[in-house]
């Protein structure tokens, strides 16, 4: 298995879409993304590790994000590009290769960049493990997420805007 650890640092997006942490994906059939703080929140203790593992039909996405405000909820998305620069704007919108609508993770018609919202426990840690059947780690696949940004947003997801 090829495990590659990549990280990127980004600053704040425009006021309503500030990033808490960001990382870029690389490698396959399993890849580990290290989330590191952005300049959006100072000081910013947000850090995390997310593993994407290829399955026969989809990808297992599992990991842990630390340094969140206890009890807080955060939007969590795969973005179009793997660049977290230019105040986070370089990552583009949510990954959406089929032009689907923005909605909840695994809901019919939802776009491929949608991941479950992160909810921090009393210690400020969000742990998750889900099967995502809308993404792939396969070269050439339209829904391949390798090389894209993984973003923990400062605020909760409204399931409408990007």
Report the location of each language-model feature.
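N-terminal leader/targeting pre-sequences
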Residues: 2, 6, 15-162
């Amino acid at each position: 298995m090829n495990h590659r650890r990549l990280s990127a640092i980004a600053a704040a997006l425009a006021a309503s879409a500030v990033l808490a942490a960001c990382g870029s994906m690389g490698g396959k059939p399993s890849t580990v993304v290290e989330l590191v703080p952005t300049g959006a929140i100072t000081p910013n203790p947000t850090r995390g590790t997310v593993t994407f593992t290829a399955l026969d039909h989809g990808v297992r996405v599992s990991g842990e994000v630390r340094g969140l405000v206890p009890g807080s909820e955060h939007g969590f998305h795969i973005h179009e590009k793997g660049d977290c620069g230019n105040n986070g704007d370089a990552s583009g919108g949510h990954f959406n290769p089929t032009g689907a609508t923005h909605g909840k993770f695994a809901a019919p018609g939802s776009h491929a960049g949608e991941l479950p919202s992160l909810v921090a426990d009393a210690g400020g840690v969000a742990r998750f493990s889900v099967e995502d059947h809308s993404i792939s780690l396969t070269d050439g696949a339209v829904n391949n997420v390798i090389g894209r940004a993984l973003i923990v947003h400062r605020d909760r997801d409204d399931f409408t805007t990007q």
